[in-house]
Amino acid sequence: MVTGIQLNKLKVLFFAEGATLAHVARPLMLAKELNPAQFDVTLCRPEAFSKLTTGLPFRILDLECQEAKIFAQKLAHGSPLYDFATLSGYVDADLALIDQTKPDVIVGDFRLSLSVSARLRSTPYIAICDAYWSPERPLNPPLPVLKFTRYAPIPLVEYIFRRIAPFAVRLHALPVERLRKKFGLPSLGQDRRRCTWTSSGR
């Protein structure tokens, strides 16, 4: 007797970039919430966060990532967080994992290279991102904690930051733009917000 129809599980591949704990925790929490009867989940995370992913009911794979301390140093100086060479290496690592798991959909948290990697494999891509980076709203990001902010009055620093923010956004987008050009993908308009938010839709 036929008791039901066996449906294929949706294969979801999560990329948890190792920049900060938050970038690992968010994909991890989402992966845990997916019903294992409906979803075939794989979570890729840097080996440094292995203690967070023991004893889970889905597959865990190591992910090549820039060291968190390097990310923190660049963030403190207001420098672009990833250079072209790093992102190019990320694409190679991404493609190897995508080819290994053959997902139906990819979910990434601050894995900027997925703007390219997912496109090269024609796989739907969902980007996890803070809402204030949405290009659908006016550019008004919160003042980051930079190395020099402790030495100047916050109102003055905020005033300066608001005026240079559009230029800083373009500067931070340059490595991703160069990466997309290398692989023949269209420009995101030198807008860093689109590198983290709407790259999932392009």
Annotate each language-model stretch with its function.
Residues E33, L52, V116-S117:
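Hydrophobic/aromatic ligand-binding patch that stacks against planar heteroaromatic rings
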Residues K11-L13:
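Residues that mark the start of a beta-strand
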